[in-house]
Curated annotation (Swiss-Prot):
Compartments in which it is found: Secreted
Entry protein name: Insulin-like peptide INSL6
Cystine crosslinks: C30-C177, C42-C190, C176-C181
InterPro entries on file: Insulin-like, Insulin-like_pep_6, Insulin-like_sf, Insulin_CS, Insulin_family, Repro_Hormone_Insulin-like
Similarity-based family: Belongs to the insulin family.
Signal peptide start and end residues: 1-19
Sample GO molecular function, one term: hormone activity
Taxonomy, superkingdom: Eukaryota
Any one cellular-component term (Gene Ontology): extracellular space
UniProt keyword list: Cleavage on pair of basic residues, Disulfide bond, Hormone, Secreted, Signal
Chain residues in the propeptide: 53-166, 202-205
Organism: Bos taurus
Length: 205
């Protein structure tokens, strides 16, 4: 009987040590593999529930697009056995060109909108203004939530990357893809999701 007990205790210790090694061991994760690992660490997601909620699905798809900023190349480097990673070839528009495009769209759509608004009956215009006032508090709440998350992510970024500017430029996904991330480092990505869940629960009460 004592021998069986020692055997069980030994197996338990081996399992615990393996789990501890797994937490501290850095794994190289890229693209969908990185996103799936983060989702798994943040908690089991009820996908049938997520499909009904458009905003959260869009958040996941946006996160997926950001994570997949590196595309694997089939060729391999002569110095290493790992695949060579290159940046996506699609050019990203600059902020100046984006601003110019938005201004052009505003200039084109504004006269037409004003003309339609001027021809609306007085009652309809009152309803439109009252509906926009009803939406304003909700928009303000979303903006405050985004500011809070941005500040938190900046603080965590400094803790995670330190004061090294080159590391900050490389970014989270590139570091996990090229050098590897531990589970402790990946858990940092769960904090915005936890805040989102808490906000949803608060709104439901």
């Amino acid at each position: 009987m004592p021998r069986f007990l020692y055997l069980c205790l030994g197996l338990l210790l081996v399992r615990v040590s393996r789990e501890l090694n797994d937490i501290s061991r850095a794994r190289r994760l890229c693209g969908q593999h990185l996103l799936h690992e983060i989702v798994k660490l943040c908690g089991d997601v009820n996908w049938s529930h997520v499909e009904k909620e458009k905003p959260f699905t869009q958040l996941l798809s946006q996160a997926s697009e950001k994570v997949e900023s590196f595309i694997p190349d089939r060729s391999e480097s002569s110095q290493t056995t790992f695949p060579v990673w290159r940046r996506a070839t699609n050019p990203v528009p600059t902020s100046a060109s984006q601003e110019e495009a938005i201004n052009n769209m505003k200039m084109q759509s504004l006269p037409e909108y004003q003309y339609k608004k001027a021809n609306l009956p007085f009652k309809t215009r009152q309803e439109e203004s009252s509906s926009s006032q009803d939406i304003s508090p909700y928009i303000h709440e979303i903006i405050e939530f985004q500011k809070k998350n941005t500040n938190k992510i900046k603080t965590l970024s400094n803790l995670f990357w330190g004061n090294h500017p080159q590391r900050k430029r490389r970014g989270y996904s590139e570091k996990c893809c090229q050098k590897g991330c531990t589970k402790e480092e990946l858990i940092i990505a769960c904090l915005p999701y936890i805040d989102y869940e808490n906000l949803r629960k608060h709104q439901q009460l």
